């Protein structure tokens, strides 16, 4: 299975300013596999340490963090010589031993020749809770579920993925039915590596759904195991409300859908916990279109999306036939899946600020508005081929953006400053 993040890891390996690397991401998005595969492909040897299942390693880091001493201990544990130039050190579930995190500072300052990559499913929570952290002494890489282009590659359609990257839209249009069929499959399967691998090998949607159910069950177990007891019920209620939140025409998060009479102060910690885990994406509202968009962020108004479109369908009980064959009763939730899909693809684009826009009266709403650092692009999302976009026109008249995007199942088309970008090509938005 190919992950685009592998290119970023290789760039990190070759950098003269390399620091210990921390890979962030939700549970089961493929962090462990990526680190091990990176070691297998680009290093002579790999020493893998899982701090969740190895108490001896906790003892090693408990006292002195002298790097020579630590390397000796790792060599004794692994039974292998650690060559700074040819050995990859992998620290997995590193949040379980906070002093292992702290040691990264000393590796950077005193032994930068060693190649160290770290990951942890709940690392975001550990950092937020005040674990001593080597600020400025580490590099970061965020890993998400497989994007649609990665899904195409995993499904044996590498050339189709390459064609999207080349943005040859006349040729892309010639093969649009292949892309549309694959996109419908992606809506069901999503991008969680185990689900994608199963689908690529067996094409069994029932098996995919069982895998997704197991992943969701593991997340629920994490709530009980790792979250503070007093907020576990709130996390569960909030988590389970997300499909119904997104099924509404106005997808702004409403606390009253979690529990009648609920208020923001009751659930802010639960949202933060899920966000720190990487299980939800919080997309805030802006009411203006200046650069940087973050300066116009309204922290009180936001949408909550799940980490993966396949998991959203699983939580909602969406059947394969309904999605692939179509059903008139499915129209409303199709909008939820489509917006979830677009959010998920946008999140994979590096250094892209993602928000949504409404004016103060609420009469104009743009599904997403993204900040590339050089320009602000409004993005209107359509689940089918309907190209009517009244809000987008209103936005254009007010802010006159250099480019506006309407993404739908319709073919690529550019008229003046308006681009219709096919949903299956939305990853290319920053390249327009």
Located regions from the model:
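Pre-Walker A adenine-sensing motif
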Residues: 2-16
């Amino acid at each position: 299975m190919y992950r685009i993040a592998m290119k970023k890891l290789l760039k990190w390996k070759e950098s003269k300013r390399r620091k210990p690397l921390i890979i962030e991401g939700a549970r089961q998005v493929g962090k462990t596999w990526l680190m091990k595969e990176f070691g297998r492909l680009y290093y002579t040897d790999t020493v893998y340490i899982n701090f969740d299942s190895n108490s001896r390693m906790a003892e090693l880091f408990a006292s002195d963090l002298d790097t020579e001493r630590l390397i000796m201990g790792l060599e004794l544990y692994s039974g292998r010589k650690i060559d700074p130039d040819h050995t990859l050190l992998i620290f997995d579930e590193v949040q379980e031993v906070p002093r292992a995190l702290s040691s990264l500072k000393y590796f950077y300052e005193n032994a930068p020749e060693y190649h160290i990559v770290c990951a942890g499913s709940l690392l975001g929570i550990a950092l937020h809770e005040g674990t001593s952290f080597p600020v400025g002494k580490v590099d970061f890489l965020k890993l998400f579920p497989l994007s649609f282009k990665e899904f195409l590659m995993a499904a044996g359609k590498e050339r189709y993925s390459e064609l999207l990257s080349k943005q040859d839209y006349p040729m892309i249009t010639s093969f649009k039915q292949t892309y549309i069929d694959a996109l419908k499959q992606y809506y069901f399967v999503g991008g969680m590596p185990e689900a994608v691998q199963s689908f690529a090998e067996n094409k069994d949607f029932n098996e995919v759904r069982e895998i997704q159910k197991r992943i969701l069950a593991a997340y629920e177990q994490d709530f009980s195991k790792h979250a503070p007891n007093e907020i576990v019920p709130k996390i569960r209620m909030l988590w389970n409300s997300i499909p119904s939140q997104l099924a509404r025409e106005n997808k702004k998060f409403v606390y009253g859908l979690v529990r009648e009479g609920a208020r923001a102060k009751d659930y802010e910690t639960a949202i933060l916990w899920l966000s720190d885990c990487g299980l939800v994406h919080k997309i805030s509202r802006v009411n203006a279109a200046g650069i940087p968009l973050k300066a116009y962020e309204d922290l009180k108004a936001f949408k909550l999306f799940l980490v993966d479109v396949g998991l959203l369908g699983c939580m909602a009980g969406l059947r394969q036939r309904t999605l692939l064959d179509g059903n008139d009763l499915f129209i409303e939730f199709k909008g939820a899946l489509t917006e979830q899909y677009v959010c998920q693809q946008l999140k994979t684009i590096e250094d892209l600020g993602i928000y949504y826009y409404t004016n103060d009266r609420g009469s104009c709403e743009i599904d997403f508005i993204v900040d590339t650092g050089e320009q602000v692009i409004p993005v209107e999302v359509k689940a089918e081929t309907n190209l009517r976009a009244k809000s987008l026109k209103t936005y254009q008249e007010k802010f006159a953006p250099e480019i506006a995007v309407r993404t739908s199942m319709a073919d690529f088309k550019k008229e003046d400053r308006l681009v219709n970008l096919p949903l299956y090509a939305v990853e290319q938005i920053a390249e327009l």
